């Protein structure tokens, strides 16, 4: 358990046990399974915005839809340790995912996802959302890989359909095996 400055709560830091299901289900490549295990009903990519106002609307839309899906449970929030981005609890132990990337993983919720990381100019993206989020029941997973200009999401078909149809989100449905790179984007 760790404490955040100005916060009187203690927060549980995740271990490799909380992300084994992600690590064992993802593989390198350009398909959605480079970020999301092939265990969900539906998948989508959501392009990251380019300006601050669009970021705020994007983040609010994502959190509202994910919150509708998983309001009554805790969420795991993952912050990628790039050396430049805010990872919230910099001295806490990290987990390793994907191709050796280190994440701080903390059990919290939608409110903390919206407020712990400050949005604004930064070396990578400007949004406040964590790079990795999933609820305790693993019913959905959101992952923004450090070198992509989009977010990958897997979950129930109804949730993914709502994300893909939301007017504030530039999202598209993606099938397993399909290149997840959004149109007009280049995979790293």
Label each PLM-derived region with a short phrase.
Residues 98-159:
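Amphipathic protein-protein interaction modules
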Residues 144-188:
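Alpha-helical oligomerization segments
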Residues 1-121:
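Extended, low-hydrophobicity segments enriched in charged/polar residues
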Residues 34-44, 49-50, 70-71, 128-142, ...:
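N-terminal low-complexity, intrinsically disordered segments
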Residues 55-63, 78-84, 106, 130-142, ...:
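Generic detector of bulky aromatic hydrophobic side chains
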């Amino acid at each position: 358990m760790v404490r955040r400055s100005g916060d009187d709560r203690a927060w549980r830091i995740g271990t490799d046990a909380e992300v084994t299901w992600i690590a064992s289900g993802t593989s390198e490549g350009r398909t959605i399974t480079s970020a999301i295990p092939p265990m969900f009903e539906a998948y989508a990519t959501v392009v990251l915005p380019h300006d601050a106002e669009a970021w705020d609307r994007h983040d609010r839309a994502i959190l509202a839809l994910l919150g509708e899906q998983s309001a009554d449970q805790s969420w795991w929030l993952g912050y990628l340790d790039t050396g430049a981005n805010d990872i919230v609890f910099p001295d806490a132990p990290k987990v390793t995912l994907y191709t050796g990337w280190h994440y701080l993983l903390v059990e919290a919720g939608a409110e903390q996802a919206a407020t712990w990381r400050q949005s604004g100019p930064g070396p990578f993206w400007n949004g406040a959302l964590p790079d990795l989020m999933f609820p305790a029941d693993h019913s959905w997973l959101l992952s923004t890989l450090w070198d992509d200009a989009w977010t990958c999401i897997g979950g129930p078909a109804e949730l993914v359909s709502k994300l893909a149809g939301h007017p504030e989100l530039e999202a598209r449905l993606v099938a397993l095996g399909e290149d997840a790179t959004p149109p007009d984007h280049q995979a790293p």
